[in-house]
């Protein structure tokens, strides 16, 4: 809905389940809004290498991507330099890249921590998988959208989907497989 070229580039750190599921969730949402969209995907095999991330993003932009999913730092810098848009990840970097960050998928780790600490406090703690509490349905995630950059119909569709996730009428498919490029 925002991409004019129908090509979105995605640069990730490592192809691990926690990263893969974020990328797949974004891909599913983008495809729901625009069934013609295709993806270019690359992993850096590094958690922090902004120059490498930037070069990967430049290559994707040169291959036609006009929106970048910035799972790593450096990607939004490439988007700024080439006049493209980006989606942020984990934290909201819109103030660092004004006019570039369409939205950021935010992680609220407090929901997970509160659940675990609450279980310790009430004596019910067990070694368990608390990862579900990092999901939007449990207030572990949200979106920060720049409404000046994202069309109103897209903002409305996102708000409706977020409400459906929170009330349980839509369940996000968790896909831990490594995402790959469409072309």
What are these regions (language model features)?
Residues 1-183:
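A residue-level marker of the well-folded mature domains of exported/periplasmic proteins
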